[in-house]
Amino acid sequence: MEESGMAHESAEDLFHFNVGGWHFSVPRSKLSQFPDSLLWKEASALTSSESQRLFIDRDGSTFRHVHYYLYTSKLSFSSCAELNLLYEQALGLQLMPLLQTLDNLKEGKHHLRVRPADLPVAERASLNYWRTWKCISKPSEFPIKSPAFTGLHDKAPLGLMDTPLLDTEEEVHYCFLPLDLVAKYPSLVTEDNLLWLAETVALIECECSEFRFIVNFLRSQKILLPDNFSNIDVLEAEVEILEIPALTEAVRWYRMNMGGCSPTTCSPLSPGKGARTASLESVKPLYTMALGLLVKYPDSALGQLRIESTLDGSRLYITGNGVLFQHVKNWLGTCRLPLTETISEVYELCAFLDKRDITYEPIKVALKTHLEPRTLAPMDVLNEWTAEITVYSPQQIIKVYVGSHWYATTLQTLLKYPELLSNPQRVYWITYGQTLLIHGDGQMFRHILNFLRLGKLFLPSEFKEWPLFCQEVEEYHIPSLSEALAQCEAYKSWTQEKESENEEAFSIRRLHVVTEGPGSLVEFSRDTKETTAYMPVDFEDCSDRTPWNKAKGNLVRSNQMDEAEQYTRPIQVSLCRNAKRAGNPSTYSHCRGLCTNPGHWGSHPESPPKKKCTTINLTQKSETKDPPATPMQKLISLVREWDMVNCKQWEFQPLTATRSSPLEEATLQLPLGSEAASQPSTSAAWKAHSTASEKDPGPQAGAGAGAKDKGPEPTFKPYLPPKRAGTLKDWSKQRTKERESPAPEQPLPEASEVDSLGVILKVTHPPVVGSDGFCMFFEDSIIYTTEMDNLRHTTPTASPQPQEVTFLSFSLSWEEMFYAQKCHCFLADIIMDSIRQKDPKAITAKVVSLANRLWTLHISPKQFVVDLLAITGFKDDRHTQERLYSWVELTLPFARKYGRCMDLLIQRGLSRSVSYSILGKYLQED
């Protein structure tokens, strides 16, 4: 009868909770029975118009038992394995009746209730239910209303990999694999098991849940299985399919040493099994895997395909507007499939598609469209473009994919122990600030994540995977975690038991321990990325030893804001008796690991992308094997049947950022015939040769400065050091005081002070990343502008203080921002260099006027270059003109967009400091 009554609960009478990625619905009538709980206080405060779910940064698997108790006021039998973690949740949520029940259970006054189906519903829920819920991004209209319903975990395949990715009603095992592991062991990915591909990760379907042990071995070269492991036959069968000799031998060795068989009964490897090594197997190009994946789907699921590229044209990506891409983007934050990494692979891609049948026709059309002759964007790009800034607070909800599992937590939790995100061997951003890939065991990471949340270890009472867990702890390189494991009583008992069984020391028992008191924070946060947002809830300070009847708590909710500016202000509290870690500054000081560079850019992890400056000439043969030694016209003939009419005009325009060391100024390069041009990073690079510079015949041989005596520095010292773009691991190197108490060097000028000649701004701000999810950022910017009065005429909008902002995202890619900054620096530097060198005021005025007219689009980039190089002291030759013209024409639109974003940043109060230099005052008569 109870369930029958529950079936009549309307959607409006249900409260929805997202607990670490598990979704739960509780009827108002049930939750109202616990009026003192934080769940009721926060949920009942929601208005009917809000229709929001609450996010709780806690273990969703354990919350299943809380959810069951809310329905039945009983404890399920399966909860006995994790009573300590359940007690922690009940205490934090202020569920006093549940705390009393747990106390009675310890005293033998309460009996556990055996449930008929004590399994996560995520393992058996209808796909139709999931499909509807996911596509509309809001709670289902028909939530399951049964005490046996223990929560919906948005878990692949019932989340990430259902239709259209998979059309099946059966459970499918899956695994996230870093692409560097796939490159090392190509047999892991086949045409049949590949589910999706991103720039850093491949998602594959597995035959069994034991596949995680295979991946663990390939990562650590150790077979680490649970105690009394009984599925060795299933594991061995999966290993034989992969044919990786080292893996095969390791499993055979394990069987022999665990008593499953003896050396005399274990048959030797057959000649065809495991005979080849992974290194000898050819690694498939990305485009073969990506395109082979797409052609499995109907055109209706793909929608309109399009191909995107980096500015140099070497890296190609394919995406579309169909339901398939929309579905993946909702989960991974990106839906671009990588195709190529070098110019030579673009040739190979064309040849590959030429041999494909009509199934690949939509892809051919997309590539043909991409390769058609295009002109650069018009200079006046701001008419059809809107500057946007996304603010990421510490309460940003991050989806973390680990092996065969995924979790949801907050950015603040991940930043508590910066060693996690500072570990490039294990951590990869799929989409910066949204989805994170961790190269580890998914089941073990659940316990690691609980430690990050609570500051202490909570392991099941019958935990059996100590060797694997110890290995995982060591590889995360978190001293506090290692210390917590060393102090764990269950771990001590296990080591003593193993020592008594075997005198050989287990290397995994030797942990590197650094004494450090763990901290504990609990937050409920709003998910700013979902259509259905989450309201923040915070736990009140309490102690592990606080009696349940004395524990109290209050909830703090943030005000409603525009969707573009949603953020939360956390109230940081301690739930454990251990104090916060000594020397633990603000959350912001832990940001160094937020953007660990996964090695995309060669040997210099802090440098911009290194791209080959290669010019594709239609009439010349390549002298190297990369690209292929065939005429370009022959390549074009391969795609002639694709109706490429103007193929003779088809050429790539590489734009390269190279660097000899991480601390040197980046050099931008542009194609001109078969040569590359240096970036005009300073005006000296374009002035006349000095005698000393002629001794260096390199690309920058003409970069000698003029032979003038420098005069006194201007009042404003331009902030133009050889500043490198940083990776997030550098964040913690900044001084905490500078972050918490930023002081502007100079106030913004009054509008009356700003003349029409322009202003140079130096702006320091929270880390700014691109909209493409790339893991690089800028923390300071030099901006040339003529529109400072716009900032004075605009009232700053309500905005979080910089201390509450972890990072920002502009509506530009990181590559576009990189070149935009260089253009701003170039314009500022040619002006300030003229002032520093005490040029005649007529020359300085000419330079200032040219920059102003270029910025306001009163002259073209070509005319700007001609007039600039005609000024005395600049190198004026045809080669220099063409190089500089190409560079300005390409970078100026990006600079104008970046300047507009920076204006918006200042207006919203997101800058840390702003200083300026008014150019007109340098031209005044003495």
Swiss-Prot record:
Cellular component annotations (GO), alphabetically ordered: nucleus
Residue list for modification Phosphoserine: S270
Molecular function terms from GO: identical protein binding
Domain BTB: 18-72, 398-485
Name of a matching Pfam family: BTB_2
Stated name of the protein: BTB/POZ domain-containing protein KCTD19
Function: Transcription regulator which is essential for male fertility and for the completion of meiotic prophase in spermatocytes. Regulates progression of the pachytene stage of meiotic prophase and promotes the transcriptional activation activity ZNF541. Required for the organization of chromosomes during metaphase I.
Taxonomic path: Eukaryota, Metazoa, Chordata, Craniata, Vertebrata
GO biological process, one term: cell differentiation
Region listing for Disordered, in residue ranges: 673-751
Organism: Homo sapiens
Keyword annotations of the record: Activator, Differentiation, Meiosis, Nucleus, Phosphoprotein, Repeat, Spermatogenesis, Transcription, Transcription regulation
Subunit: Identified in a complex with ZNF541, HDAC1 and HSPA2. Identified in a complex with ZNF541 and HDAC1. Identified in a complex with HDAC1, HDAC2, DNTTIP1 and ZNF541.
Main location: nucleus
Compartments, as annotated in UniProt: Nucleus
